[in-house]
């Protein structure tokens, strides 16, 4: 019993380390290209393409049966490239020639392309494309049966946007305005006559003209610390951690006593 428990804990710890250390990025895609030409007959010369691209990222996760201080942080998952796109065309010739062509695709994900030409017949010469792109991200999760202080922070998942549906740069930019003509400079004002020393009485000068130190009001703001770590308050985390540690100890002693 003791050896089985020890092997199970070691296996779980190894699996958790592998999952937590995996920061994957899916760059692969799926594509299809087909052509049908010169296929006379009924319902002939048709092309159906359905490439499926399902990238799955699993990173920054912890799985513990009995675990303490097993964090997973700073992992990133990303699916680069665009989404699915493609064309759907179908022109069936009733007793004539059916021609259909289409090119679909994007810079990533799943894409399909092809054409159908010179296929006489009823319901022939059709071309159907159904590219599917379904990215799945699972990151930054913590699963504990009996565990304490196993945070998952700083884990990111991202899927790159499609290239076909993006707006070309510069379409919404406002052109720079024309420079205004500078106005004619006005006549300079005649400088005032400097006042004599007898014009001002000592003590009548304002505070703005008096040399010396001046008090400047500082902007008031509430002091705040950067928000880091978990949202769980410390007063609740410590009792929960102690209880989890005690529960793990009790389970271990029961397993040891039953041997």
Curated annotation (Swiss-Prot):
Disulfide bonds: none annotated. It comes from the Bacteria. Keywords: Amyloid, Cell adhesion, Cell wall, Peptidoglycan-anchor, Repeat, Secreted, Signal. It holds the Pfam family ChpA-C. A motif (LPXTG sorting signal) lies at residues 225-229. Residues 180-189 have a biased composition (Low complexity). Disruption phenotype: A single chpC disruption and double chpC-chpH knockout have no phenotype; a quadruple chpA-chpC-chpD-chpH knockout has delayed aerial hyphae formation and sporulation. A quintuple chpA-chpB-chpC-chpD-chpH knockout has a longer delay in aerial hyphae formation and an almost complete lack of sporulation. The quintuple knockout still expresses ChpE, ChpF and ChpG. Quintuple knockout chpA-chpB-chpC-chpD-chpH has strongly delayed aerial hyphae formation, makes many fewer aerial hyphae but no effect on viability of the spores produced. Induction: Transcribed during aerial hyphae formation on minimal medium, about 10- to 25-fold lower expression than the short chaplins. Strongly induced during aerial hyphae formation and early sporulation on rich medium, under control of ECF sigma factor BldN. It is a peptidoglycan-anchor. Residues 39-79, 119-159 form the Chaplin domain. Belongs to the chaplin family. Long chaplin subfamily. This is Chaplin-C. It comes from Streptomyces coelicolor (strain ATCC BAA-471 / A3(2) / M145).
């Amino acid at each position: 019993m003791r050896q089985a428990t020890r092997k199970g804990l070691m296996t779980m710890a190894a699996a958790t380390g592998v999952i937590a250390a995996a920061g994957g990025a899916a760059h692969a895609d799926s594509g299809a290209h087909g052509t049908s030409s010169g296929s006379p007959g009924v319902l002939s010369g048709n092309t159906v393409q359905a490439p499926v691209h399902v990238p799955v990222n699993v990173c920054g996760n912890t799985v513990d049966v009995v675990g303490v201080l097993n964090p997973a942080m700073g992992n990133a998952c990303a699916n680069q490239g665009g989404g699915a796109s493609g064309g759907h065309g179908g022109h069936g010739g009733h007793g004539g020639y059916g021609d259909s062509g289409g090119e679909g695709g994007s810079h990533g994900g799943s894409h399909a392309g092809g054409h159908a030409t010179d296929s006489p017949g009823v319901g022939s010469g059709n071309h159907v494309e159904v590219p599917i792109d379904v990215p799945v991200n699972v990151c930054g999760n913590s699963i504990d049966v009996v565990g304490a202080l196993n945070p998952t922070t700083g884990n990111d998942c991202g899927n790159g946007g499609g290239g076909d549906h993006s707006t070309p740069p510069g379409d919404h930019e406002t052109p720079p305005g024309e420079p205004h003509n500078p106005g004619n400079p006005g006549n300079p004002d005649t400088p005032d006559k400097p006042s004599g020393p007898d014009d001002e009485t000592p003590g009548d000068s304002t505070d703005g003209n008096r040399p010396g130190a001046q008090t400047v009001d500082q902007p008031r703001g509430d002091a705040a610390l950067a928000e880091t770590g978990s949202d769980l308050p410390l007063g609740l985390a410590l009792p929960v951690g102690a209880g989890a540690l005690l529960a793990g100890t009790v389970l271990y002693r029961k397993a040891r006593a039953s041997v």
